[in-house]
């Protein structure tokens, strides 16, 4: 039976799959994309009688495709922490779904594998801006601060690589980056040996240097909203910059609007770290989605921006 691995191109999706394939290697076909390219099941809608492993994309957003794939005799193993909606019922469907704000898909895989490759779950948790969870996992392994810091940087750099409107915006396609990880069961070996990581580190430094000169376009008691122009570096840095400003002001919500080539906006929302709730509720109102702590909108029309600002304030004003 053919194997197909479908995964979000961010650190969480890549590290979740890496853990599973270290445990159970397969000659799988890989299906992935940029961070926001999460309707990945549409790409394989004709698949029949295969084993699908799906990681870190919303089952709610992919529901129609998922139901069709189950009807076509595919066995589906699903690990995710985004808004799920109604969970399909099928003997072929094996869900591992937990939408709690302190977990990511790699933590769900870590649980499934009884912590066999926990170091990679720590990498993913840092990448997903779940620093408290990451430090708790690091504490369970008694990692020293230097090693924990290396895993933090690794997670944030892999995550940085996922953000863009298309693959052309990225330093590496997520498939290439995943394949670069595959020979390494130990993330510290990858950290010290990887040429890809050096390129990501340089790109990250350059892009963040530009982003840190930006000021909010709107600031209220609810939070801060930033707006970036239509340039590749703006798209690349959007996720890690959003995470950084969220950590700097943990009691505030944050949003970042990045202009797309068609004039609409790509929007990232971070709920306050001190109260990680409501991001997905806000974004669903604008045909977006995500999870309670962090969510997004793929195409916010310019005429909807003011309404988004008002809804943001309403959602996060205490």
Where are these regions (language model features)?
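Oxyanion-binding "anion nests"
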Residues: 96-100, 180-227
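Short N-terminal helix-initiation segments at or just after the protein's N-terminus
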Residues: 59, 162-174, 192-206, 236-242
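Loop-centered beta-sheet repeat module
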Residues: 134, 138-185
């Amino acid at each position: 039976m053919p194997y197909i691995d479908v995964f979000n191109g961010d650190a969480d999706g890549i590290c979740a799959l890496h853990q599973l394939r270290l445990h159970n290697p397969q000659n799988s076909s890989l299906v992935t994309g940029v961070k926001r390219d999460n309707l990945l099941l549409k790409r394989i809608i004709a698949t029949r009688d295969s084993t699908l492993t799906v990681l870190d994309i919303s089952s709610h957003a992919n529901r129609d495709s998922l139901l069709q794939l189950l009807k076509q005799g595919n066995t589906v193993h699903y690990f995710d922490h985004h808004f799920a909606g109604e969970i399909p019922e099928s003997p072929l469907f094996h869900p591992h779904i937990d939408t709690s704000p302190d977990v990511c898909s790699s933590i769900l895989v870590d649980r499934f594998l009884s912590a066999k490759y926990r170091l990679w779950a720590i990498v993913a948790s840092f990448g997903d801006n779940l620093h408290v969870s990451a430090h708790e996992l690091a504490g369970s392994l008694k990692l020293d601060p230097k090693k924990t810091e290396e895993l933090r940087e690794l997670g944030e750099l892999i995550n940085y690589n996922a953000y863009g409107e298309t693959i052309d915006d990225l330093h590496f396609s997520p498939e290439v980056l995943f394949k670069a990880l595959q020979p390494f069961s130990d993330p510290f070996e990858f950290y010290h040996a990887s040429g890809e990581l050096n390129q990501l580190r340089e790109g990250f430094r350059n892009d963040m240097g530009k982003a840190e000169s930006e000021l909010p376009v709107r600031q209220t008691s609810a939070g801060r909203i930033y707006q970036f122009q239509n340039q590749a570096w703006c798209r690349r840095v959007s996720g890690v910059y959003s995470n950084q400003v969220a950590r700097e002001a943990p009691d505030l919500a944050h949003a970042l609007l990045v202009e797309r080539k068609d004039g609409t906006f790509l929007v990232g929302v971070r709920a306050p770290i001190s109260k990680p709730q409501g991001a997905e509720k806000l974004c669903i109102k604008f045909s977006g989605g995500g999870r309670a702590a962090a969510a997004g909108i793929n195409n916010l029309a310019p005429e909807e921006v003011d309404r988004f600002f008002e809804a943001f304030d309403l959602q996060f004003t205490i």
